[in-house]
Design a protein with these regions (language model features):
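Catalytic beta-strand/loop cores that center a nucleophilic Ser/Cys/Thr
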Residues: 145-225
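Helical hinge/lid and interdomain linker segments adjacent to catalytic or ligand-binding clefts
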Residues: 31, 38-127
Length: 261
């Protein structure tokens, strides 16, 4: 009887221990993985682009604290490699883009495998000298064509109010002083591109030294083949002076983090 009782006790202890281990394992698996956003920028570029990037780092660090994701930044573009990008859900390019073949290849691989990207202003700059056809297609087949000068505020029209990116901005809002880029061809005709915000035609002509006289000038769009958003804003120290535009930046980041592809 004593042996039988002992076996029963041992069996009970084993079952309890197994249940405890399973419970701990399930609890660990149930914990949500903290998402990580990594911002790239350069300090050796145009001063107004550096100012924007430094302000953006502070802005998105504050957004991270509010929304509970990890945020880090780097000025070393060699961090654009598979090892460093492992576990990163979203990349930000604040004022430039990669230049070396290895950096570009790492970014292409990251995006083709479902990575996320949000680029600002000069991060989308490309022309015939850039020599990166993949990136032109990534932006929707569009190439930088010109800009206004000096930086000026502009009225923006929201093309899609149903998007999670634009849900907290009005149909029309004033954006702080910025250097606005023109694109040729416009990315809009591309069936894979979703234009979210456009420079309002009531702004034309905009500029003094260099002028945008008219035309279709998208300023925020996504290539739906990827988890990405391009924003033309990003020149100077006034970009974060608009609460409406700040909500746009915050919601765009959240939207990209929550998308799956």
């Amino acid at each position: 009887m004593k042996c039988k009782a002992s076996r029963i006790i041992k069996t009970t202890y084993s079952r309890v221990a197994l249940l405890a281990i399973l419970s701990l394992s399930l609890s660990a698996n149930a914990r949500p993985t903290t998402k990580h956003v990594l911002a790239f920028y350069s300090t050796g570029v145009e001063r107004d682009h550096v100012i924007f990037a430094e302000q953006a780092v502070k802005f998105f660090a504050a957004v991270a604290r509010t929304h509970g994701f990890e945020f880090s930044s780097t000025t070393d573009w060699n961090d654009l490699d598979a090892t460093r990008l492992h576990g990163v859900q979203l990349i930000l390019w604040l004022n430039e883009s990669p230049h070396t073949p290895s950096q570009r290849a790492a970014f292409e691989n990251y995006m083709e495998r479902g990575g996320g990207w949000m680029g600002f202003h000069a991060a989308g700059y490309n022309d015939e000298s850039t020599g990166w056809p993949w990136f032109v297609n990534f932006l929707g087949g569009t190439v930088f064509y010109g800009n206004n000068w000096p930086p000026l505020p502009a009225l923006l029209d929201v093309d899609d109010r149903s998007s999670s990116v634009t849900r907290r901005v009005p149909s029309h809002f004033m954006s702080p002083a910025n250097e606005w880029y023109m694109w040729k061809p416009s990315p809009r005709p591309n069936p894979e591109v979703k234009v979210l915000i456009t420079l309002a035609r009531s702004n034309y002509p905009i500029g003094l030294k260099d002028t945008i006289e008219g035309g279709d000038v998208p300023v925020v769009w996504s290539n739906t083949r990827y988890r990405m958003i391009y924003m033309n804003m990003g020149h100077g120290d006034k970009i974060f002076n608009s609460a409406e535009q700040n909500r746009l930046f915050e919601d765009a980041l959240e939207s990209l983090l929550n998308q799956s592809r």
